[in-house]
């Protein structure tokens, strides 16, 4: 059962869109969510993106929202949160879409990279509850314009693309938004994304001096008219290299296969470029996980039609099982934005939660909680699991986390409807199933931990997990790995394939706790 505890928790965030009227595609995109522990107290905190008034885009009446800002909620550990964005120095009055939390300099504290319509901002965590803007020294603001219009960034994935031990960053950019454009046939309606040009996503390489340079074209990743809505980095073909899935809006998706540092776009050949009708839809992002227990990582792509579920066949290709899995009938016409795999009942298989709402107009939809039967077939059980799932909303960003550290995954969803509030859904748990939470730390920082593959064996059952939390629309999930164990109260064996190629094995791990594993040193903290 999920209980809406938003008000009780003190989360008073309201998405403003910088306006009173909902009239353009920028305003329809919604608010991103980032889960991270900014003060290292073992409790996950929350960063919510907002849209401030934009001169020349927002209606003049929207000037009352010129001071709208992003909000940082510190977890108090008692089920409540305190908003501390101004004290921490991460409020800002820009139009923000998403943020990536990462310990860039390996000082033990999570930094924050905020992606905006306009210049991006990188906040360094000072370790005392405050942040400072170091964007200029890093070179991560991004270009002022792309394809002739203001740069519109929607997300970031960090990983060590060239295996030099330093974190690099790929920034997803969406489209060349012309605020003055009106559709010829329907000038009073919001234009479709298909009517605009795109903007190239950009790969930034970190140099030994800590600065970043644009290496997009050098790595065959430059597509100047693409319309990225989400980036997911993982090793889909099990060759030891991290690949890139780019979800594109009203275009074919991209899958950049990494062969020893050389990228090639293979989405069509791999079977993940389009939906089951061969059409590039309004893809939002990709969530990854093994939905049928075969040890291979599958891909869930949310879109405004019925989404796509691609089953990994283990030979570098995927099979579209959206219909046979039951997803097509459950998600048809819902307008899905955020969608995420999670084992909400800790029974040892991955379920799905979605945030829904029609794009062009504020047509509300029911959110979905889709139960996995263990074989990759899904059924909506939302209305049986809380009143939120019986209430139509217009959802956007969605993150899965465990805010109270009880081992049962909670959910937070942002909205662009008239309420425009976030919804914190507490998982009441109570079924007696066991679980394990895991934080991976690489030997020399996050570089060898991001994208690492973890195989958990308990009671003869194997589950494969990928250490990647940037897998939701505009949002970052709880950075800790979570695995449901059903009735098993210990893990017999835990295998880690680190992203730098190193391998480690651990045995006989007691369940129902959060652990930290430091590469080369083993279990270092609970």
For each feature predicted by the language model, list its residue ranges.
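Beta-propeller fold detector
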Residues: 3-7, 82-86, 132-138, 213-217, ...
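Repeat-based blade/solenoid architectures
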Residues: 11-32, 66, 88-100, 139-157, ...
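Gly/Ser/Thr/Pro-enriched helix-cap/hinge segments flanking short amphipathic alpha-helices
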Residues: 19-20, 211, 329, 360-363, ...
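Beta-propeller blade termini
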Residues: 30-40, 74, 95-110, 124, ...
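Hydrophobic beta-strand segments that make up the repeating blades of beta-propeller
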Residues: 43-50, 107, 111-116, 169-173, ...
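Short, conserved, GDST-rich strand-edge loop motifs in beta-rich repeat architectures
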Residues: 49-65, 174-196, 354-363
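Beta-propeller blade signature
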Residues: 69-76, 197-206, 257, 367-373
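Asp-box/WD-like beta-propeller blade repeats and closely related beta-sheet repeat scaffolds
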Residues: 84-104, 115-161, 176-194, 198-200, ...
């Amino acid at each position: 059962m999920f209980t809406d505890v938003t008000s009780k928790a003190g989360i008073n965030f309201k998405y403003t869109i910088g306006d009173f009227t909902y009239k353009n595609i920028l305003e329809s995109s919604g608010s991103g969510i980032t889960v991270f522990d900014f003060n290292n107290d073992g409790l996950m905190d929350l960063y919510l993106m907002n849209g401030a008034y934009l001169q020349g885009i927002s209606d003049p009446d929207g000037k009352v929202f010129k001071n709208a800002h992003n909000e940082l909620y510190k977890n108090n550990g008692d089920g409540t949160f305190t908003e501390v964005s101004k004290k921490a120095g991460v409020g800002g009055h820009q139009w923000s879409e998403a943020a990536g939390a990462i310990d860039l300099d390996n000082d033990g504290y999570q930094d924050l990279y905020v992606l905006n319509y306009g210049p991006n901002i990188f906040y360094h965590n000072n370790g005392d509850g405050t942040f400072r803007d170091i964007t200029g020294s890093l070179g991560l603001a991004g270009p002022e314009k792309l394809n002739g219009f203001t740069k519109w960034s929607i997300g970031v994935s960090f990983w060590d693309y060239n295996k030099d031990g330093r974190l690099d960053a790929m920034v997803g950019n969406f489209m060349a938004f012309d605020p003055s454009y009106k559709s010829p046939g329907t000038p009073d309606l919001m234009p479709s994304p298909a009517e605009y040009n795109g903007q190239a996503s950009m790969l930034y390489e970190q140099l030994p001096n800590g600065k970043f340079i644009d290496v997009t074209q050098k790595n065959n990743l430059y597509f100047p008219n693409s319309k990225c809505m989400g980036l997911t980095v993982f090793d889909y073909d099990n060759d030891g290299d991290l690949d890139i899935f780019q979800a594109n809006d009203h275009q074919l998706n991209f899958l950049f296969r990494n062969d020893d540092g050389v990228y090639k776009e293979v989405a069509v050949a791999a079977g993940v470029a389009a939906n089951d009708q061969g059409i590039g839809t309004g893809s939002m992002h990709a969530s990854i996980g093994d939905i049928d227990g075969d040890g291979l990582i599958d891909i869930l792509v949310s879109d405004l039609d019925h989404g796509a579920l691609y089953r990994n066949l283990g030979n570098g290709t995927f099979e579209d099982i959206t219909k046979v899995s039951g997803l097509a009938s459950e998600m048809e016409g819902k307008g899905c934005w955020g969608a995420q795999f999670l084992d909400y009942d800790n029974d040892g298989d991955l379920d799905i939660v979605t945030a829904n709402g029609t794009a062009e107009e504020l047509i509300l939809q029911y959110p979905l909680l889709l139960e996995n039967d263990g074989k990759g077939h899904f059924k909506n059980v939302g209305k049986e699991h809380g009143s939120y799932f019986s209430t139509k909303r217009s959802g956007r960003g969605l993150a899965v986390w465990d805010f109270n550290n009880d081992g049962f995954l909670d959910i937070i969803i942002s909205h662009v409807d008239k309420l425009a509030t976030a919804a914190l859904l507490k998982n009441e748990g109570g079924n007696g199933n066991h679980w394990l939470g895991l934080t991976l730390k690489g030997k020399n920082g996050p570089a060898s931990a991001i994208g690492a593959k973890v195989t958990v064996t308990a009671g003869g059952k194997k589950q494969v997990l990928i250490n990647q939390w940037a897998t939701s629309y505009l949002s970052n999930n709880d950075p800790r790995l979570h695995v449901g164990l059903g009735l098993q109260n210990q893990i017999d064996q835990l295998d880690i394939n680190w992203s730098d190629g190193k391998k480690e094995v651990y045995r006989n791990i007691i369940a129902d706790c959060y652990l930290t594993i430091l590469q080369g040193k083993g279990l270092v903290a609970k």
